[in-house]
Amino acid sequence: MDRRTSLLHCSKNERLHALHFVPMHANTKTRPTIALALAGGGPLGAIYEVGAMCALEESLNGLDFTKLDHYVGVSAGGFIVASLANGISPRELCASFIENDSEPSETFDPSWLLKPAYGEFVRRGMMLPGLVLSALWDITLGRKSLMSALERLSPALPTGVFSNAAVDTKMAQLFSREGRTNDFRQLKAKLTLVATNLDSGDSAPFGSPGWDHVPISQAVQASSALPGLFPPVMIDGQYYVDGALKKTMHASVALEDQVDLMICLNPLVPFDATARQFTKVMQRGLPAPKREIPRIVDGGLPSVLSQTFRSMIHSRMELGMKHYTHAYPKKDIILIEPDHRDPEMYLANTFSYAQRRHLAEHAYQQTRQMLRSRKTGLSAKLAKHGITLNHDVLDDHKRHLSAPPKAPTRIGRAIATLQEVMDDLGETVATAARLTAH
């Protein structure tokens, strides 16, 4: 007698009881869903995120950053998650973005972002003669004061210094290779790249229904168009700029998608210059030399603005994380970010690419240190989602982000040692120059 026949011979109550449990069994999830949200932070932010993810992936059994369920990226974080969603691993990102030793077609060249926005300059410059004549006419007729008349010239100012058109072009080429796609709708996982509509101030979740017709590469370009640095990006007749203008993380996009575990990476934090300095993490697994860190005000306007910017975006993120905890009490949220007492990430230039190897190694080692110090709490939280700490990897103090895959030759070891010495020397000279200037 099959199940259908047996149900017909049951009483009414027995049939209702049996039917009640069938759909519940059918809808039971076979595995937890995991999402990743990456905040922005310029080249420095991307460098930190690559180094941190390399440490996380090798230290956490059961976590594969290329096989998550939902990816959310803002600004520089959009570049990283778009690559992960296309199957490019953190180690491959490290090879192309940090080490520059991948295939030429996949190597990131920072010069892409340093080309002047000639088109913007020309377009705005062509407006200048008419604006000048209009201002002079107002002054001559006494309609406006000199300062008021000069305000008419503001439309001639470029909206961005550099062109980020290469972001769209290069990433479109990168995602056109076999096994990858530049179409949100063809990805195996969900990908959301958040930009900000310049005219309305609303968030634009590219990749969500109604927003998924836009090429991934163009969405990355829009999400990373920092006002003043890059011109706004026009998509479907609307102008879009950096997604961080609205929120720092935008993790709620994935949390609303009912994920079980939310991993968030935030690369920019305000520096606590009053705390005892935390400088244990370093290149060769040894404590870094202690350095005298000047007060924020002693660094002049750039330092004050940097601290202000970091404090503003971090306070927004803290409020967002508190909201997530109350709004999604059954979800596990893990935040990874630099230590506020660590001067290494603070002293680095947010838009610098020169120190990428040193900073990526620092992020890698600091993340490993964080996992060791928080292993008790993290183990319990991660275990619910089938993820465990790899203690052998975490306890191996000789591991490095850029360690060669095989034993180097004598010449190779000499070159590696020389490179380390030169990196240390460059950092020492830069620090001395900063201290001397103050």
Regions found by a protein language model. Name each.
Residues D2, L7-V74, F79-H438:
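Patatin-like phospholipase
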